[in-house]
Every structure is written in C-alpha cells, then in structure tokens.
C-alpha cells in the first residue's frame, strides 16, 4: 500500500500528479495521470494530451489517502526498478 512515508519506493504509473515547482515555469500546475516512467522522465496524460516532463527539475504533488505529498524530483530520478529495490 502506498503511503506518504513510502511513496518514493513505489510504482508511480497510474497515479495522478501535479507539478508544484519547476525550473521551467511553463510546466508549473501541469497535472494528469502518469502513463509511463523512465529514469529521468514521467509521461503524463493531461487534458491537452501526453507530455514528457523531466523528473529532476520539478517537485511533484501526489494525493495519497486524502493527503497531499510533495516529492522532490531529484529523489526519484532513478530507474523505477532501482528505486523500488528490484533484484536481477
């Protein structure tokens, strides 16, 4: 189960997110559902279509159990497999 304490060790695909801070002011406020994740990017399904956004340059807001959790992109800028702790 995803909680505010363990969100950085879970899968993000399928979660809704919003960019609350970024080095690129044009993406602040962008929100939608995460459709894909790579080491450095999220692909988000927004009202205006799919957008690929760099993880490390933004802070991301997720709503978990009616609580908003802000995650620094630099903390999650890893391959999902490595972040989750998978073994080969």
Swiss-Prot record:
Keyword Nuclease included in the entry's annotation: yes
Location of this chain's protein in the cell: Cytoplasm
Single biological process term from Gene Ontology: tRNA 5'-leader removal
Gene3D superfamilies in the record: Ribonuclease P/MRP, subunit p29
One Pfam family from the record: RNase_P-MRP_p29
Broad class of enzyme this protein falls into: hydrolase
GO MF annotation list: ribonuclease P activity; RNA binding
Classification via SMART domains: POP4 (SM00538)
Known EC number: 3.1.26.5
Swiss-Prot/TrEMBL keywords: Cytoplasm, Endonuclease, Hydrolase, Nuclease, tRNA processing
Gene Ontology annotations for the cellular component aspect, listed alphabetically: cytoplasm; ribonuclease P complex
InterPro entries per the UniProt record, alphabetical: RNase_P/MRP_Rpp29_sf (IPR036980), RNP1 (IPR023538), Rof/RNase_P-like (IPR023534), Rpp29/RNP1 (IPR002730)
Reactions that this protein is recorded to catalyse: Endonucleolytic cleavage of RNA, removing 5'-extranucleotides from tRNA precursor
UniProt key word Hydrolase: yes
Subunit structure: Consists of a catalytic RNA component and at least 4-5 protein subunits.
Family: Belongs to the eukaryotic/archaeal RNase P protein component 1 family.
Function: Part of ribonuclease P, a protein complex that generates mature tRNA molecules by cleaving their 5'-ends.
Protein's recorded name: Ribonuclease P protein component 1
